[in-house]
Amino acid sequence: MEWHSKFSGPNTSPGFLLWQATQSWQRKVGKALAEFDLTHVQFVLLTSCKYMIAHGETVTQKKLASFSQTNIMMVSEVVRTLEKKGFIERSKNPQDKREVLLSLTEIGGEKVTAALPIVEKIDQAFFAAAMKKENFLSGLQELLKHE
């Protein structure tokens, strides 16, 4: 069987390397978040919601999806799960009855407060070598501009 690729192998393919790094990082974060009864995606959306509220934003599922750059349908499903767990509350917007507002419950806020430092510690350890490279963060930011 012949092999044709622009790259000499998997270790020179940026997409494959990013995939592997992402999988490794997500495994570490997922393992740490299990003790908080959160998946990685639940943590990201819950933390994003808390961040947005702390910065004076009214949070809707649409705004949360945009902020976290995730699919609105996935956000809807995850928010439903977070609501069942008692971490998020949904309510109708008094100014626009079609719009659903999101807020954290006390326990949801406590989950973020407890889990965030642990996830940040994992991030610091996992990305330490790459952060020494001058353009690592700006390179990631540049990738997100072209979506």
Swiss-Prot record:
Keywords: DNA-binding, Transcription, Transcription regulation. One of its GO terms (molecular function) is DNA-binding transcription factor activity. GO terms for biological process: regulation of DNA-templated transcription; response to stress. It comes from the Bacteria. Residues 61-84 bind DNA. SUPFAM superfamilies: Winged helix' DNA-binding domain. This is Uncharacterized HTH-type transcriptional regulator YdcH. Residues 11-147 form the HTH marR-type domain. InterPro entries: HTH_MarR-typ, MarR/SlyA-like, WH-like_DNA-bd_sf, WH_DNA-bd_sf. SMART domains: HTH_MARR (SM00347). Pfam families: MarR (PF01047).
